[in-house]
Amino acid sequence: MTEHVQVGGLQVAKVLFDFVNNEAIPGTGITADQFWAGADKVIHDLAPKNKALLAKRDDFQARIDTWHQTHAGQAHDPVAYKAFLQDIGYLLPEAADFQASTQNVDDEIARMAGPQLVVPVMNARFALNASNARWGSLYDALYGTDAISEADGAEKGKGYNKVRGDKVIAFARAFLDEAAPLSAGSHVDSTGYKIADGKLIVSLKGGSNSGLRDDAQLIGFQGPAAQPIAILLKHNGLHFEIQIDASTPVGQTDAAGVKDVLMEAALTTIMDCEDSVAAVDADDKVVIYRNWLGLMKGDLAEEVAKGGKTFTRTMNPDRVYTGVDGQDVTLHGRSLLFVRNVGHLMTIDAILDKAGNEVPEGILDGLLTSLAAIHSLNGNSSRKNSRTGSVYIVKPKMHGPEEAAFTNELFGRIEDVLNLPRNTLKVGIMDEERRTTVNLKACIKAASERVVFINTGFLDRTGDEIHTSMEAGAMVRKAAMKTEKWIGAYENWNVDIGLSTGLQGRAQIGKGMWAMPDLMAAMLEQKIAHPLAGANTAWVPSPTAAALHALHYHKVDVFARQAELAKRERASVDDILTIPLAKNTDWSEEEIRNELDNNAQGILGYVVRWIDQGVGCSKVPDINDVGLMEDRATLRISSQHIANWLRHGVVTQDQVMESLKRMAPVVDRQNAGDALYRPLAPDFDSNIAFQAAVELVIEGTKQPNGYTEPVLHRKRREFKAKNGL
């Protein structure tokens, strides 16, 4: 049992109580008594409201289920269906026009466009890597991934392969010609770079000199002007740096001694307390809060072993250059950090209220992550985050404007507890639940003074799409979802509503994750679709991917693109409400088996590491051994998809169990190299992870909105108790 300490009307887990009093509070200007008294009141005032909002979710779902059951066997009538959703208050009248009025937003969010990382803050090494991914090597990203083909002798190999290196150099020179064109000639022919009279002078083959077509692109340099070691350029609001050192293995093969091009990459990072972590008790939550506190204080550090050597990884300092006018130019050396709190659903026993009930985890996250952020706000930090005095909190999985209003109220109450000016706490609204999508304008309006971000989370959104219409019939195959009418309308609608409510220049309009971290050539080809769609940020799975995705923001001027898109006809709510039902369900046995196996294998591969190792975000090989980033959102889709096919007789429970049991040894084989791994097969009945997977699928229709957290949390706690963790 967790040891608790009585504080006013709260029982606080001792590990959390000690962390707050001894680590988080000192230096904030707030006393422990103040904090706990304020937390007590916030929890007891707002927990009942939180509970009522969850009851409303269940009521809507029950009504929608009944409507579909009543109309079973009939052709779906979209007009009657929409009228029904309006009658019950699910689809609300459109909010009156307004403009968001958020103040004190950092440029990285309001006025720049670039990649966004999402990482589990529970893992200090990942958190530090992401924080430092504001700047990334283009050469490393190209050389070390499939972005550069291994054909024609360009294999990666163990040592440096000059053939491959030359391909990387050629790619980078082409980028320079595109992003910083010369007034005459090409970077391809450059033999030297220097600064003279505040301008870039480029020596070319043949002896001639050239300069930038637009001299304003030169921002600064490092080293002597006549022999700079770095040249800082700017294009589409993003910086990049030509690094020069002819003594390096790469530089000595380059005519101009260029050793790398450093990209300004992950402008922002979401430090995640939610879908990518496995945190089920006070001990887990303190790990999260301690890492976030370290990021806010600027002193997070981690011992890292690499190549037989151990070193301490810390947060990078700012970058300093000599400007063209001779004055110092200082650029942020780190990604601007958001923190993603959990949503409104779960409760946790890290704190118990006066009646002995677990408190809403989202309220706890809000209080603790905001408390930690004071250290960055008040100058205690050696690595300041926001330069405008804001704290950026992403709030996921909200259903409709009442829930957005509740978050707005919660943030106001937290500001009062922490003596923060009103609207210090900013909100990122995840548009990943159907009731938020169709009422998005009203959701933004409910937080119009705090909103700094809307983002389409198509993975969770697909899970909610399936669960909401669970009773309507069998859904299309999972891979076909991406081409269904609702999803394109949903993606466009988010941009349309964001632009019409004045988010440009104040907030990010974001797009979802590239889930295949090993397939960078495909990402380079495809993910340009996100800036073209009007998104000034989109999610990437790694610092390497951030450096490559940054190239897309040099190809697309997102703010100009948004101005074009603002003139188009708005996406249709009717299209968004189009249920992705299969037109016919006469799939072959092989097609059904493949669908089932693919889902089952992904579920098992993710759940086994969640339950057994407490790992909330994994690169899980799919059925074709392609590594996919899996988190709770992908688990929600896969489990709900099987549950839907089971509900409508496309598959039987016996088929589902047979697939799970057949896929378990496949997952075991894929994890054979992990010393900490515990096999799923053959003792299925006593394997907690396997039983969790079974429950998620077989009982999938009963999970609240199709969420996986209730089962995962219960089973992880069972595993920890059984194994003395």
Curated annotation (Swiss-Prot):
Function: Involved in the glycolate utilization. Catalyzes the condensation and subsequent hydrolysis of acetyl-coenzyme A (acetyl-CoA) and glyoxylate to form malate and CoA.
Encoding gene (name): glcB
Ligand binding (Mg(2+)): 432, 460
CDD domains with a match to the protein in the record: malate_synt_G
Cysteine sulfenic acid (-SOH) PTM sites in chain numbering: 617
Cellular location(s): Cytoplasm
GO biological process: glyoxylate catabolic process; glyoxylate cycle; tricarboxylic acid cycle
GO MF term set: magnesium ion binding; malate synthase activity
A Gene Ontology cellular-component term: cytosol
HAMAP family in the record: Malate_synth_G
Entry-linked Pfam families: MS_C, MS_N, MS_TIM-barrel, MSG_insertion
Keywords linked to the UniProt accession: Cytoplasm, Glyoxylate bypass, Magnesium, Metal-binding, Oxidation, Transferase, Tricarboxylic acid cycle
Residues involved in acetyl-CoA binding: 118, 125-126, 276, 313, 541
Family membership noted in the UniProt record: Belongs to the malate synthase family. GlcB subfamily.
Catalytic residue positions: 340, 631
Domain of life according to the entry: Bacteria
Subunit and interaction comment: Monomer.
Enzyme Commission designation: 2.3.3.9
Cofactor: Mg(2+)
Catalysed transformations (reactions): glyoxylate + acetyl-CoA + H2O = (S)-malate + CoA + H(+)
Residues reported to bind glyoxylate: 340, 432, 457-460
Protein name as annotated: Malate synthase G
InterPro entries xref list: Malate_synth_C_sf, Malate_synth_sf, Malate_synthase_TIM, Malate_synthG, MS_C, MS_N, MS_N_TIM-barrel_dom, MSG_insertion
Pathway(s) where this gene product acts: Carbohydrate metabolism; glyoxylate cycle; (S)-malate from isocitrate: step 2/2
